[in-house]
Amino acid sequence: QLMEWVVHELKPWIDSTYRTKKSRSYTGIAGSSMGGLMALYTILHHNDTFSMAGCFSSFLYPVMEDLKKELHACSLKESRIFLSWGTDEFRSKTALAYGTDRNLYITQQLLQKGADVFPYQHIKGKHNEASWEKELPIALPFLFEE
């Protein structure tokens, strides 16, 4: 429901209130943690509206099985997706290995669907705004590359 509101109410309001380039090719969504997961779901389900997604430290663990089904069922037009995770977000090296595996699995599935994906493992990156701020100079040029 939230993403329906974003697509059908918030984006039209932004486009009517501000001078924007309204087309899909200029429209992206980004978020961190649960917001990163929502950005990923949004580009999967509203790919006719969004061509870019920045998914910073997406909260993947509890929804991975459902996400696998979503990835299998989706079709993507030309899309750019930035996926990041920090090495210091995890409590152990085993957890880091699982987190890295999940992000690379998603990367592989998105690539098979035709998306351009930038998987970024932030060395010493934490699950906080300070780390995500450092990732923006990497993510934005990729997402808005012409």
Q: Residue ranges of each PLM-predicted region?
A:
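Non-catalytic cap/lid and distal C-terminal segments of serine-dependent acyl enzymes
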Residues: Q1-E146
